[in-house]
Amino acid sequence: MATPHINAEMGDFADVVLMPGDPLRAKYIAETFLENVRQVNDVRGMLGFTGTYKGRPISVMGHGMGIPSCSIYAKELITDFGAKVLIRVGSCGSVRHDVKLRDVVIGMGACTDSKVNRIRFKDHDFAAIADFDLVRNAVDAAKAKNINVRVGNIFSVELFYTPDPQLFDIMEKYGILGVEMEAAGFYGVAAEYGAKALTICTVSDHIRTHEKLTAEERQTTFNEMIEIALESVLLGDK
């Protein structure tokens, strides 16, 4: 049954959903990588699609920016539309000199300055982590394509324009691979409702050096990340 945010029915979404933040990215993924595509959501312009990749049903759905928006769509996909596996595919910024532009980062764990997981976990710390099998399959898929990936902790910030740049020094000290805005809450939702989740990001900006990918570089690296995500799903079916 449709929700206030998704005008679809049970069965419209596959059990595996790739989730970029930008709904136009969802459209691009569906049109570029999937076959037999049909649109299954357009509420508030948050586009969702279902198709097949090498014969395997897969859906793609935007989630917007930040933990609150991402959490709404992730929760409803799980509880109202039967999603079992959610893979966030997005971009992140680097705070480390050894994590470069175009690197692909797999978020094994996600730190955050958000309180959402403390709210759901009775004010205790919750270790927001990805599903191990999804991490392993993504690493194996990247190796098969000779794409180097970095695996470790990322950081989900509440504020894109942070008033405390010293936080980046602490992130670097603790080995944070990338900074984004969703993964910690995304993992919390998956844990609460019994689904598996993974975040894969490409480094599009370097917070220290102020380097940024060109539009062409961003697209090429984005495609590599999507290929890793899709191939990892096939590995998970074996």
From Swiss-Prot:
One of its GO terms (molecular function) is purine-nucleoside phosphorylase activity. The active site is at D205 (proton donor). It holds the Pfam family PNP_UDP_1. It catalyses: a purine D-ribonucleoside + phosphate = a purine nucleobase + alpha-D-ribose 1-phosphate; a purine 2'-deoxy-D-ribonucleoside + phosphate = a purine nucleobase + 2-deoxy-alpha-D-ribose 1-phosphate. The keyword 4Fe-4S does not apply. GO terms for cellular component: cytosol. Phosphate binds at G21, R25, R44, R88, V89, G90, S91. InterPro entries: DeoD-type, Nucleoside_phosphorylase_CS, Nucleoside_phosphorylase_d, Nucleoside_phosphorylase_sf. Its EC number is 2.4.2.1. Homohexamer; trimer of homodimers. Belongs to the PNP/UDP phosphorylase family. Catalyzes the reversible phosphorolytic breakdown of the N-glycosidic bond in the beta-(deoxy)ribonucleoside molecules, with the formation of the corresponding free purine bases and pentose-1-phosphate. This is Purine nucleoside phosphorylase DeoD-type. It comes from Photorhabdus laumondii subsp. laumondii (strain DSM 15139 / CIP 105565 / TT01) (Photorhabdus luminescens subsp. laumondii). The lineage of its organism: Bacteria, Pseudomonadati, Pseudomonadota, Gammaproteobacteria, Enterobacterales. The gene is deoD.
